[in-house]
Amino acid sequence: MIQQETYLTVADNSGAKRLQCIRVLGSNRRYAHVGDVIVATVKDALPNMGVKKSEVVKAVIVRTKATLRRNTGNSIRFDDNAAVLINEDKNPKGTRVFGPVARELRDKNYTKIVSLAPEVI
């Protein structure tokens, strides 16, 4: 579960390395799960890339440390909290996605992120 002030790693090559969640989008929501959109600020970034430090961006959650239960009865848990930066059209800002992503992204119409990911779990 991601909430305000949670730090996340960035799972793409947009230039940002770490994010801090400042708001979970949705009407009066407290926690974000896989596939949810958050507003975050960039805490660490590579120089001469697309995003700068302290820039406010939107991101979609692709991995969480909290256990994710599926309708089939399976549960899955990742080693880190990670997000991918997106633009206003819900397309990723980067051209590559690092690490596995959850299958629930396909159900939430983030097919571009799923196709860029090396592994879908």
Swiss-Prot record:
One of its GO terms (molecular function) is structural constituent of ribosome. It comes from the Bacteria. SMART domains: Ribosomal_L14. InterPro entries: Ribosomal_uL14 (IPR000218), Ribosomal_uL14_bac-type (IPR005745), Ribosomal_uL14_sf (IPR036853). Disulfide bonds: none annotated. One of its GO terms (biological process) is translation. One of its GO terms (cellular component) is cytosolic large ribosomal subunit. Belongs to the universal ribosomal protein uL14 family. NCBIfam families: rplN_bact. Part of the 50S ribosomal subunit. Forms a cluster with proteins L3 and L19. In the 70S ribosome, L14 and L19 interact and together make contacts with the 16S rRNA in bridges B5 and B8. This is Large ribosomal subunit protein uL14. The gene is rplN.
